[in-house]
Amino acid sequence: RCCGYKMCHPC
C-alpha cells in the first residue's frame, strides 16, 4: 500500500 507521495510501506 502506498501512503503519501511515492512512499510505499505497510500502513
UniProtKB/Swiss-Prot annotation:
Keywords: Disulfide bond, Hydroxylation, Neurotoxin, Secreted, Toxin. Expressed by the venom duct. One of its GO terms (cellular component) is extracellular region. It is found in: Secreted. Its main location: secreted. One of its GO terms (molecular function) is toxin activity. The cysteine framework is X (CC-CX[hydroxyPro]C). This is Chi-conotoxin-like Ar1311. The lineage of its organism: Eukaryota, Metazoa, Spiralia, Lophotrochozoa, Mollusca.
